[in-house]
Amino acid sequence: MKRIFISKNEDDLGDFGQFCEENKLTLIAKSLITFEAVDFKLTSEFDCVFFSSIRAATFFFEKKPVIPKNVLFACSGKETARKLSEIGITSSFIGSESGNPEKVSLDFAKWLEGRKVLFPHSNLSKFSALQNLSPSYYDTVQVYQTNSIPSAIPNCEVYVFTSPSNLFSFLIKNKIPKNALIIAYGQSTKKQLDSLNIACLVVLKNATLYDLKKELSRCFILRKE
């Protein structure tokens, strides 16, 4: 059986474990990063809050910030929008391709139309959503910290890296076998792989498990042994 590593914990994978079992893949699932809240204060006015992930939203709302009633919410993609809706937050802007930060940023800049946005983030944020905005149209606030927890991972045939920070943490204690197939959760992770001269087979347009399963099937990784 082929082994597949994904830098997410099993609790976050829904039925992906069953999918791997049905397709004769031995799953190794482990996030190599942890997160902790950071105290923050909101010091300026804003018209919109943009969440690049549900994690940013969770840490933001955990501190119960005072938000004016007319403030709109925006997010990077459908999965984040779905999770925001579960906590009662309606997204007025939803990125059409969460795995393509450049497109999300361009579309968001057009939608924003001169309004001011607040961007909650981690210490390792690349601020991709803001790249097409003038600094006068946004404020940033760190709401959580990302920490590496390196761990030795058995050699696998397939590696799925869900973020640049998980990739960085993985490489502290591991090397990628020569003929391994690499899948990146979006362009930010691909750029990190490119910078290390690591070839990437697939970049997910949308960073979802549904898209991952679809790409695994499409690329014939799941050939029966």
Walk through the language-model features, giving the residues of each:
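Signature of uroporphyrinogen-III synthase
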Residues: 1-225
